Amino acid sequence: MARKKRTMPAAEVYEKSDSFGQLPSAPPISPHRMDHIYPDSYGSPPPLHQAYHVQPARANYVPDQIARFNVIKPDRLAKRHNPQLYTKRGCTDVFCCFLFFVFLCGWVVVASLGIMWGDPQRLIYPTDSEFRRCGVDQGGYYNFRYLQFFQIFTNKDIFSKRPYLFYFDLTKCISYATALGGCQTTQICVEECPSQYFSYLQLRTASAAEIQNKMKNVVYCTDDVDKSTVTTFVALQSLVQRGKCVSYTVKSVPVLQRCFPEAIFNAVDNVNTVLNSSNSLDYLKRTFGDDALIPQDIQITGQSSEVMKSVVEDQPVTHKVIHDLSQTWWQTLILIFAAGMLSFIWTVIMRLLGSLLIWLSIFLVLGALGFGAGFSWIKWNNLKATGAIDDYSFHPAFDAYFEMPTTWFVVAIATSVLLVIFLLVILFIRQRISIACALISESSKAIGSMMSTLVFPLFPFLLHIGVFALWGSIAIWLASSGQEICRMKETNGQVYNTSTKCDCNAKLAGCTYVGIEKESDTIFWLQVYNLFAFFWLSCFVTALGDIALAGAFASYYWARDKRHDVPTFPVIRALNRAMRYNLGSIAFGSLIIAIVKIIRVMLEYIDHKLGKSENKAVKWFLMCLKCCFWCLEMFFKFLTKNAYIMIAIYGKNFFSSAKDSFLLITRNIVRTVVVHKVAGILLFLGKAMITLGMGILSFYYFSGRWVVEGVPKVDLYYYFVPIVIVVIGSYFMADLFFDVYEMAVDTTFICFLEDSEQNDGSLERPYFMSQKLLEILGTKNEIPLHTK
């Protein structure tokens, strides 16, 4: 709506001629600045349409110090075109925000169902053959149904005192993975793992008192066996043959609350000593007789003595790794911290020498192509001169093909063509490369002026950890969900699927635990919902971090005076602005990525289900779909990232921002490709050099090749353990810094494109870009403004 004409003080009116009373025409309408607010006050911007456009007074017309009215200086006029300061903002994509809230409520319901139906102890604690959890006092009669009645009340925590799972026949579950998943042998919960080698044949000639002593301290039996009644070898042999008592034991150690032979994980004694002393089953078999129920030592270990020596020595590998970490933790932290400092220094180097590094990389590529082409032509000419012939039949020696002139002729042609193409491309886009160098330099300045941007990524990183923990916890609860089923024994002592159900918590004789009954389809779809929630929230957290950083870097770009106009705590301000107005848009963009991710997971699931299918057409179709959706995900990530930058600048909804950013990029596609490739080269060089450098440094230090005076030398079992940790930590630190740098480059680039398209350097629409960028573009502002 047009505003009423009002009389303006003469001190504020400035026309291009010496007479005054004439007002300049309104500036061209910007599709973005149509939303700007122009309050009716002298310190605020004037309306865009059908209103007087106020210009700053000339310095020689009304001096600032004696001006009666508020004189609009060039800097103040420029601030009026800052989209972050004078853009009308409101809540965007409210429906998506509401949908996101409803979805989170649904996730809470899924978590509640998992907690109500599940029991993670089923996955954490081992279970015996009766599906009783070792180390846990479950309650319920089926835990103690074979015990005397008084034991139920006097030893209620009996299974909490039996934390370890013992396997009767180790040869049936010697595989570690099989042991974790269960094996086809009797398993019972015990107070401690066997501490000696034993064969029941040792008791062939033993007295009743000796048998009673062994039954009490050495022999393991199921709970339904009354050991006090076993006084003869014949009775013990009958129990062993029926699988009620163990036929042998080996010296074992607990690993993940399961008893495994010490010979596998901790060969305390020399292998030859073990195999030739009383501490072996072979010795017991030679001494007390052979039995099919008692395996050989080699069957127990599953490996020969030579392999055992090479794999296991004085201590378990885990103990050695823990020892190494305890000895080197502070050196490791120092090296990782040094990697962070190097990452920061690299950002400074990119600010000072970014252009040099870029052009140096370009000239190195040109030099390599030129050298390759020249060498190939010389080699081809020499081979032709010596009369070499071409013979491309099969040759076992691959080098023979490089003694044929045609091979070098093809290589020479290829490298020459690549050299010409690369040279022409460089000549064509040389100005755009200069723009990319200047933008990278500006991004480095922005990071240097706002050091909080380097610390901020820790906030979304912690949120990512929280989201992952929530997803993992809910997934575990859902995976462990199910109803415990107990049934009464039949008269023959067996339990069938048709047997009468009974209450597992009831103290009923004959009530037997038979397993867990699950609603497989329901749990499957709840897991899908949980996984989709993980994808959506992860993308949401990433988007929130991106839009906060984009807002901070945009505030730096659009600030006329970089020292005074950049707001205090720019990242926190941008984050607050995003959470106040743009949560719906963030939810919308992250929803798109999450949908594509879940589709890719479903395609992988279908491919896994059809893994044994011989239908080539179906497999090819699935492969094409997976490839297409991967490309689609990459495209949407690129699109949403630029949309978040536009949202941070103008505060529009997601669709409008995505459309504006996409059209802006397509109008400047060559600049976009060049900037992204050039920035990618610099970031790759930075990550590679920092990670490789810290890896080499840690190798020389932890391997003892580099001795530092005053620092004690460390003796390690596996010096590669701290090296791997340093390399991973260094890459993480470099990635943390360079992700911020990448966002700074992308935001600065979008702001630069907007600035170059919407402004023309006039008094009405001055450029906000740096003087270096203005020189590259060959333009300037009519009145130089503060750009420091």
Swiss-Prot record:
Subcellular location as annotated: Membrane
UniProt superkingdom: Eukaryota
Transmembrane segments: 98-118, 329-349, 352-372, 409-429, 458-478, 531-551, 583-603, 620-640, 679-699, 718-738
Membrane topology: Multi-pass membrane protein
Pfam families for the chain: Choline_transpo
GO BP terms in the entry: transmembrane transport
Coiled coil as UniProt keyword: no
Residue positions with a glycan: 276, 497
Keyword hit for Thylakoid: no
Main localization (coarse): membrane
Keywords carried by this UniProt record: Glycoprotein, Membrane, Transmembrane, Transmembrane helix
GO cellular component terms given for this protein: membrane
Entry's Gene Ontology molecular function annotations: transmembrane transporter activity
Family that this chain belongs to: Belongs to the CTL (choline transporter-like) family.
Protein name according to UniProt: Choline transporter-like protein 1
Species of the source: Caenorhabditis briggsae
